[in-house]
């Protein structure tokens, strides 16, 4: 689009970037959870509260609730019912994503959703084995989010995916797993660069792709849906950013997600992990679309994982209270499963504490020690 509006636009061509290799990163792939060792380890459950259908669960820890939820996941897998996982970027950045990768490879997870920040961290980990810059250190000099490869390669992948008529998540999968697609992305990103010697050029593949959830899902043939906003991601800061491409490809992903929700007519599980707004809102709209077309998610089971105490009170419904606006507690853990005759769980705590025992219970339920 050629802008013809009344206001002055920022000229993104003036933005200065730097090679990703010179930027320090705070987290390494080597720090990721060792799921093989976890399977053999003793199960340790958090002692923070857990809730079922908005009511406190019992026991000295979360073991009863996590076992119940794991049982639902195992039962759905064996019955061929969908199991969907939505996360923010932090489960990727804090090293818990190997849990999702294993469940994808085993055919348990049937669709994975995240935001563009999740795609960004996945890209940097797959390319360099490290991610997560220091915002505090980089912001004063205007270097925050300005690593060239992160912006250019991801933006070009989205733009080429747009031209190919595929979704944003599928474009990311092809970047890691399709050599021809990857070459197009790298060539386009570097086309106007006079000196490319300092840039990573992964023509032969991404060295750490095995730690990438997008690659795992693409190889398994299941969707990854990326639910994007404009102006929320470091890729939007770059001259290579194409808002039309980002919107169109993410829009396609949303329709893929909505279609997956139509498979829940006889039940299924949705896990919402660390996404307080994106996940709940995407789920709410998709569920409404499914119900509108005669394919309501009957008996839906949800699991919501976050650090905040559970304070939502669906009986009072007091819009003057702050708890009313905690969308994950309201929609994911309470209202959506209640409306469709299902069960909603909420587990308070850091993902590093709540996700490993859930994974252990699932794997043992599958008979994998």
Predicted ranges, named:
Residues 1-45:
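N-terminal amphipathic/basic leader segments beginning at the initiator methionine
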Residues 83-86, 91-120:
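Active-site cofactor/substrate anionic-group-binding motifs, chiefly glycine-
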Residues 121, 133-220, 225-226:
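Ligand-binding beta-strand-loop-alpha-helix segment within the catalytic cores
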């Amino acid at each position: 689009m050629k802008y013809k509006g009344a206001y002055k636009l920022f000229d993104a061509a003036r933005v200065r970037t730097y090679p990703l290799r010179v930027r320090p990163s705070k987290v390494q792939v080597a720090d990721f959870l060792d799921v093989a060792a976890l399977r053999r380890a003793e199960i340790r459950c958090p002692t923070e509260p857990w809730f079922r259908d908005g009511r406190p669960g019992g026991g000295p820890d979360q073991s009863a609730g996590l076992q119940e939820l794991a049982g639902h996941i195992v039962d759905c897998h064996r019955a061929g019912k969908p199991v969907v996982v939505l996360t923010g970027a932090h489960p990727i950045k804090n090293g818990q994503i190997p849990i999702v990768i294993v469940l994808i490879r085993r055919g348990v997870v049937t669709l994975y959703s995240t935001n563009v920040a999740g795609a960004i961290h996945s890209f940097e980990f797959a390319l360099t084995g490290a991610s997560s810059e220091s915002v505090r250190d980089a912001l004063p000099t205007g270097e925050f989010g300005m690593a060239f490869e992160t912006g250019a390669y991801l933006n070009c992948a989205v733009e080429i995916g747009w031209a190919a008529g595929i979704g944003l998540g599928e474009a990311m999968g092809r970047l890691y797993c399709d050599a021809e697609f990857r070459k197009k992305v790298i060539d386009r990103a570097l086309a106007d660069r006079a000196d490319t010697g300092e840039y990573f050029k992964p023509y032969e593949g991404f060295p750490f792709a095995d730690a990438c959830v997008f690659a795992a899902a693409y190889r398994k043939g299941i969707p990854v849906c990326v639910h994007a906003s404009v102006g929320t991601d470091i890729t939007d800061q770059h001259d290579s950013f194409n808002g039309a491409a980002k919107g169109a490809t993410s829009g396609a992903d949303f329709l893929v997600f909505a279609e997956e929700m139509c498979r829940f007519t006889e039940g299924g599980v949705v896990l919402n992990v660390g996404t307080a707004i994106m996940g709940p809102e995407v789920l709410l709209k998709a569920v409404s679309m499914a119900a509108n077309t005669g394919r309501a998610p009957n008996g839906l089971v949800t699991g919501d994982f976050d650090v905040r105490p559970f304070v939502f009170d669906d009986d009072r419904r007091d819009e003057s209270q702050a708890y009313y606006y905690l969308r994950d507690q309201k929609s994911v853990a309470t209202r959506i499963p209640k409306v469709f005759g299902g069960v909603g769980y909420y587990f308070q705590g850091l993902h590093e504490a709540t996700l490993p025992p859930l994974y252990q219970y699932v794997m043992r339920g599958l008979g994998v020690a």
